[in-house]
Amino acid sequence: MLSLGSGGAKSSKPSFVSYVTPEEIKLEKDPQKKEKHPDLLPGEVVFCSANPILKYTQDDLSQRGVFGTLLCTNFRVAFISDDAPQEEMSKTFKNKLYGENDIPLMCVDHIYGVYDEKRKLITGGLVKNKCPSKMIIHCKDLRVFQFCLTFSKEEDAKRIFQGIAHHCLEEKSLKCVFAFSYLRSTNPEMLRKREAIMFDSPEDWTQEMKRTKAQCRLVTENENFELSQRLPQYFVIPSALGDLFNYQGKGLPIWCWSHHSGCALFKASFPSMTQEDGDFQSHLDTMITAVARNYLYSVKTEDLSESLPTLQDIQQSYNKFKQYFLIDNTTDFWLSDVKWFSSLESSGWLDIIRQCLQKAVEVVECLEKDNTNVLITEEEGTDLCCVISSLAQIMLDPYYRTLMGFQSLVQKEWVAGCHAFLDRCNHLHQKDKECHSPVFLLFLECVWQLVQQHSPAFQFSETYLTVLSDSVHVPIFSTFLFNSAHHRESVMKAESPIAQSRPLSCPTVWDWSVQFDSKAQNFFFNPLYSEKVKHERTVRRPHKHKHQRQLSLPSSAFKTPTKKGFFKDETDSLKKMLRVKRISRWMGSPDSPVVASREFYESWQQRPLDYHGLLLPSLDGPSVRIWMQRYLRWIPEVHIMGGGSVAIMTKLMELLSQVEDLKRVLEQRDPSLATQPDHPPPLHHRLPSFGSSGRLSSSFPFTYSRNRSFKPIIPTGLMQSLMVADNLANQEDETS
C-alpha cells in the first residue's frame, strides 16, 4: 500500500507527488516483474492490459492506493494487485467467477475520465482526446473504482482506457456476450442442476396447479411458439376460453395463483382500458367472463398502467436515487450527508416501492377478504404485472418464502412469464432508453421490505437478495439474458455447433455452486427463520366462512347467492360491472383504497401472529426503509466495526445455539422428546459461521474490517462541526 500526498518528489503531475516511485517498487520487489494475469474462466481471453496502474482506495482524504496490472477481458475488467492479499477472511464469502477488484463488463454503469482535475462522462468507446490522467468506473452494484493512468506508458494507458470504454459502453450483439464463449468451453453436464421448478414443461405446471388446487386448463399449443412468440411454451388459462388461435396470443388471462377459497389471480396484456373501441371492449368482456365462469366468482380488474408509475418514471427515479450511493471519496460523502434525507426523498424511489406494496396489498385484500378473482393488466403484461403478482403470492403463500419456493416463483412469473430482462437491464447498451427500467430490482426492493419487517417468515436472508441483485449483471446465466422463452430458444439454437445434437444450455442463476462454495451459500439462509414442523400441525387462525367452489356451471342463469361476491344476475349484469376499471372502485366503502387497505392491515395485525399464514407489510413512512446492505456496503464511512446487524445476528445465533444445546440435553433425558425424522437439521449444521463480531464490519460478508487511518473532516456546516468536535472528544476519552 502506497501513501501519496503533497511532498516534494518529482512525478508526472506537479500536484500529485509520490513518496515511493514506481522505479523503486520495481527494484524492491522484482527486477524481472511482468504483468500479472488473473485465473481466466473457460472461454475468457484478455483483450488489453497496462502496468503499472494505481488503484485508489476510498478510506480517507489522503490519496492512497496500490499498484498493479489493469486488464480488460471478454468477461470483466480486472485489477491484479502487486501486493499479496492480506485478508484471510476474504475466502469465507468469495465469488468463484470474479473477485473484489473485478468488474463484469455488464456491471459497468458509467465511465468518467479526469482531464486537468475535471471529470468528464465517457459516452462511447472511441477516445478522441488525449488519454485522461484518471479513470473512474461506476458499477451497477454501486461499487466505485478509480485508476490513475499516469504511471504507465502513454500508449499502454490509452489502449487500456479505450479498450475498457469500447467493450463496456459500445452497443453490441447478444452473440458477443461472454456466456456463449463460456458455454463452448464448459462441460454442459456440469451445468445441469435443478435448484428451482423451471416451469418449462407441462409437468411443472401440472404440479403447481395440483399444489394450489387450481381448476384451469394447461395450454400446450404454443410448444413451438405457433400461437405467439411473446407467450411461454406452456401456460395456464381459464377452462372456459375457446380456440386460442382466434386471439393470436393477445389479451389472454394467464393464471398466476389460486386461493384456497377458490378465487384466483390472473394477469393479461391489454392496451390502455380507456379506449372506446368496440372490438376491444368485446374482447375484454370475453376474457373476463371466462375468468368468472371458471370459478363462479366476480372479477375485479386493475390496469397497472393507470395506477402505478411508468417504466420511464421508474428508471428516472432510480437514476436519481443511486447517485447518492456512488461516492468517489470521503469529501463527497460528507457533502452529500448534509442533505441526505431530502435528496433521497426527492428521488421518489422509496415512494415507488411503497406504491407497489400498496397495490399488492389491494390485490391480496380482494383474494383473501372479498374472495373475488383478480385480473391485473398492462400493455405488455410482463413488467409491473410480474411485480404485483409475485408480491401478492409471497404475502399469501408461505411456500414462496422458502428459498426453493422463491426461486420457483421468479422462474414462473418472470422467466417463464417472458419478462424482457435483456432490454430492461440494457445488457447490450442499446441507445433506446425507453425500454430500460430496473423492474426486477424494484421487485427485489419490495421483497426486502417484507424480509426486514417479517424476518422469521422467510427462509432466505437479505444477503441472498443482495447477491441475486448482483447476479443480474453477470453475463453467464440464462435467467437474465433473454427477453422471452422464444428469444432464448432461437438464440441458443443459432449459437449451437452444427455437429451438436442438442442446443447449448446456459446455467441458471439458481445453480449457486457456479458462483459460491457450500460454506458461502450458508449465508443465503436466514438463521431466524421459523420453520413449520410437519408433525406439529399448527391450528390456523379462525376465519370467516369461505365460499365453496362450484365444480360445474349451471345451464340456466347464475344462481343468486345469499352472500356478496357471487354474480347476482346473468351476463348483462356482469358486463355492467366490467366497465369498472380500478380495484379501488370495487371497494364496498367510499373510502380511498389506501384507507381501506389500512383497515385491512389493522384487522390482520389484531390476529394471532402466524409466519406461515397471511403476511402484510407496514406502509407507514418509517417502515419503508433503505436497503442498507446493498447500497451502503461499499462506503467505508458508514461501516460499524464490530457493530450493526452482524453484531446483533452473532448474539442471536449464540442464544439459538444455546437453545439447541438445551434441546439435546432434554432429548437425552427423555427419549420421547427426540427429534422426528422430518424435523429440520440442527441449527449449527445450516447456519454460516460469523466468527467474532469484533473483527467484522456492519457490511459483512461483502467487506471486512480493515486497518484505516481516521482523520478529522473539515466541517461544512454547524451540525457537522459539532459532530466533529464530539468525535474528537470521544477519541480523547478513549485514548486517556
UniProtKB/Swiss-Prot annotation:
Region Disordered: list its residue ranges: 672-691
MF annotations from Gene Ontology: phosphatidylinositol-3-phosphate phosphatase activity
Where does the Myotubularin phosphatase domain start and stop, copy by copy?
182-558
UniProt keyword terms in alphabetical order: Cytoplasm, Sarcoplasmic reticulum
Q: What is the reported phenotype of gene knockout?
A: Morpholino knockdown results in early embryonic mortality between 3 to 5 days post fertilization. Causes a reduction in size with an abnormal dorsal curvature through the back and tail. Impaired motor function characterized by a delay in chorion hatching and a reduced motility. Some animals have pericardial edema. Defects in skeletal muscles including sarcomeric disorganization often with central nucleation and triad disorganization. In skeletal muscles, increased phosphatidylinositol 3-phosphate levels and severe reduction of mtm1 levels without affecting mtm1 subcellular localization.
Superkingdom to which the source organism belongs: Eukaryota
Question: Does the keyword Cytoplasm belong to this entry?
Answer: yes
Q: List where this protein forms a coiled coil.
A: none
The disulfide bridges present are none
Pfam families per record: 3-PAP (PF12578), Myotub-related (PF06602)
Gene Ontology BP, a term? locomotory behavior
Please provide one cellular component term from the Gene Ontology annotations of this protein.
sarcoplasmic reticulum
In terms of one coarse class, where is the protein primarily found? cytoplasm
The entry's localization annotation reads:
Cytoplasm; Sarcoplasmic reticulum; Cytoplasm, Myofibril, Sarcomere
Instruction: State what this protein does.
Output: Acts as an adapter for the myotubularin phosphatase mtm1 to regulate mtm1 protein stability and possibly its intracellular location. By stabilizing mtm1 protein levels, required for skeletal muscle maintenance but not for myogenesis. In skeletal muscle cells, does not regulate mtm1 subcellular localization.
The Swiss-Prot or TrEMBL record describes its family as follows: Belongs to the protein-tyrosine phosphatase family. Non-receptor class myotubularin subfamily.
Indicate the quaternary assembly: Heterodimer with lipid phosphatase mtm1. In skeletal muscles, the interaction stabilizes both mtmr12 and mtm1 protein levels.
Protein name according to UniProt: Myotubularin-related protein 12
Q: Which organism is it from?
A: Danio rerio (Zebrafish)
